[in-house]
């Protein structure tokens, strides 16, 4: 900050959540060289600002800089509901998902599973009985926190 005759003690790059609360702060060199490594998986919209602290303790804040991250959404192509704790549930994965729907059908077009809960997946059962090993069709739709819509359709192999 050039307006302080006493000079700058330090600059901090701050990350703020959607409510404006600082959840990350890092001191940076006086040339303000800063780079972000990796995707922040907690916030889809990240607000950055620079906090300047003068040698006499005065504080000044920059304007906000907003970064909007794209959501992610995908489905597996196989699962093994055999009770071993590995890939027993067929469920969607993703980041920043707000709304969700999933429908699964057998090869005859009969519905075997449906949910609107992103955390819920298919356990490989039809009417509480183990489904036969086969290829099943699915259609999934998700909406992220920014309103972007993701649509997937394809097949899932149930392996025993």
What spans do the regions from the language model cover?
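Conserved aromatic anchor
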Residues: 1-6
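Solvent-exposed loop segments of extracellular immunoglobulin-like
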Residues: 7-11, 98
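Extracellular Ig-like/FN3 beta-sandwich strand-entry sites
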Residues: 8, 43-45, 133-135
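Recognizes extended acidic, P/S/T-rich segments that occur
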Residues: 10-42
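Surface-exposed loop/turn motifs at beta-strand-loop junctions within extracellular Ig-like
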Residues: 17, 52-56, 142-144
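Beta-strand-rich modules
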Residues: 34-59
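Short loop/turn motifs at secondary-structure boundaries
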Residues: 65-160
């Amino acid at each position: 900050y050039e307006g302080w005759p006493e000079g700058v003690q330090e600059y901090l790059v701050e990350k703020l959540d959607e409510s404006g609360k600082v959840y990350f702060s890092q001191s940076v060199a006086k040339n303000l060289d800063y780079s972000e490594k990796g995707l922040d998986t907690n916030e889809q919209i990240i607000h950055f600002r620079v906090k300047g602290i003068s040698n006499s303790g005065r504080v000044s804040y920059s304007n906000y800089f907003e970064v909007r991250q794209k959501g992610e959404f995908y489905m597996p192509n196989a699962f093994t509901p055999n009770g071993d704790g590995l890939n027993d549930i067929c469920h969607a994965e993703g980041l920043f998902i707000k709304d969700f729907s999933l429908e699964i059908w057998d090869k005859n077009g009969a519905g075997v599973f449906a949910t609107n809960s992103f955390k819920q997946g298919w356990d490989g059962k039809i009417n509480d009985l183990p489904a036969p090993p086969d290829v099943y069709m699915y259609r999934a739709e998700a909406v992220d926190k920014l309103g972007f819509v993701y649509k997937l359709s394809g097949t899932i192999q149930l392996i025993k």
